[in-house]
Amino acid sequence: MEPPVKINCPTCGRRFLSDETPAMPFCSKRCQLIDLGRWMNEEIGLPHEGDPGDAPVEYLDDRDLTQPSPERQNESFHRYSE
């Protein structure tokens, strides 16, 4: 087991030994829950720049599923029996 190290809590900044808390890397369960709340409220997050190839998602309604797409209208589908 590694010896404890002094670290700063990312929520409150308090300096503590790493073996003092089960809520690592936070100094307490309270600080851990404060951080979780910030993530859930989208106050903090990971930076992300969209890929230039990312396109908006188009959703189909049920009517779109009953007809083949224009690209596939000429394809024939076969069922194979076992």
Curated annotation (Swiss-Prot):
Gene Ontology biological process terms, A to Z: regulation of DNA-templated transcription
Cofactor(s) annotated in UniProt: Zn(2+)
Binding site for Zn(2+): 9, 12, 27, 31
InterPro entries reported in the protein's UniProt record: DNA_gyrase_inhibitor_YacG, Znf_NHR/GATA
GO-annotated molecular function: DNA topoisomerase type II (double strand cut, ATP-hydrolyzing) inhibitor activity; zinc ion binding
Any coiled-coil regions, as ranges: none
Co-factor note (free text): Binds 1 zinc ion.
Superkingdom in the source lineage: Bacteria
Alphabetical keyword list: Metal-binding, Zinc
Pfam family, one: YacG
Region of interest called Disordered, as start-end residue ranges on this chain: 44-82
Family, similarity comment: Belongs to the DNA gyrase inhibitor YacG family.
Protein task: Inhibits all the catalytic activities of DNA gyrase by preventing its interaction with DNA. Acts by binding directly to the C-terminal domain of GyrB, which probably disrupts DNA binding by the gyrase.
Record's protein name: DNA gyrase inhibitor YacG
